[in-house]
Amino acid sequence: MDKKVFRSSTRPAPPRFSKNSPRGYPPRGYMERLAKQVLWAESDGGSWYKHLMNPAPIPSGAPVIVAQAPCRADLAGGTIDLWPLYLFHAGAVTLNFAVNIVTTCRITPLKGKRIYFHSVDTHKDEEFADLEALRTGKRFRHPLAARMVQFFAPKEGFLLETDSESPAGAGISGSSALMIATTAALARFTDRNLTLEQMRVIAQNVEAQIIGVPTGCQDYYPALYGGISSIHLDADGIHREAVPIAPEEIESRFVLAYTGAPRKSGINNWEVFKAHIDGNKRVFRNFERIAEIAGAMHQALLRSDWEGVARLLREEWKLRRTNAPGITTPLIDKLIAVAGKNGGRAAKVCGAGGGGCVIFLTEKGASSRVATAIGENGGRVLPLQVARNGLRYASA
């Protein structure tokens, strides 16, 4: 990139996202201003922008497609949702709830065959002359979009934009939620009438292709359905049950905090997965207990037995630390200790751990005190609101 050209004050101001627009949606006129940028680049030698998008994408006039899906916080039974681990533990179940931290996929149909990718949150851009050029690619700046498009194989050109409100490496399933949003948007764009379960299978399998290790199933259900879920992992399939708890009960008792440390969920899960499959008896026994804890926590939630939920959450965290010592960090240990002195009853990392987010269960009425203590000791408290609904299509 020619830095002198990039810093030129003569080029038009680049199109920006409006603070008043829904997150991830370009304001009206975005594509037109983008075209002006390319025209300037062609006339004034702005090679950096010519490389970014040349020729300028021209909307076809077909409707823009926008799909959104929420992230999640997991309570119990994680990692056991990896196939075939749950088949070795009778009655395996995993518990989680959707949080109103949203991912978005937006598809703008274009004239011609060119394909453009733009990630709003990671600032990554990529383009291809046509589908065949994308199919022959080996490495991608936006692998999620690229792999999904390879699967759906749309015939026409388009601009695919993604955005996620989740912090990087948070462990709240931002990537899986975005997989669901992208699956839904591309299915609609290619006129594929998929059920929610078909979307789950596609998203889970393509994500495994991207990260190169097995993926669990639990992350996709909050993105699809929202609410509080008990996901039963049986030999005849996976079955999602809505847990009938008022969302306000969850919101008043839990705090979600980001530790700022990125994590490698595939690596952490893969190490535990291998140990289980290799016959590590200690890991097997721990998973037996994790399955029992998840089942017991499901019943405790149904009874609104929050003391029981706290006890089980503490026990699950202890077992997870035994299975994978790298699941915690000094900051996580510090925040859990600080929370315990201010009304926190239990805590665990979200996802595979090694950093990212921690979910804290507090005494009734103590959530604000716990949140303040976490913020004063290096954690970043995220807004915690249960997403009442899962996947939805929004107007452009």
Name each model feature, range by range.
Residues E126-A133, F158-A168:
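Glycine/charged-rich beta-loop-alpha catalytic/anionic-binding loops adjacent to active sites
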Residues E161, A185, L382:
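General small-molecule cofactor/ligand-binding pocket signal
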Residues S166-A170, R345-A347:
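Short pre-catalytic strand/loop immediately N-terminal to key active-site residues, enriched for Gly-Thr
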Residues I172-R192, L196:
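DPxDG-like acidic metal-binding loop motif
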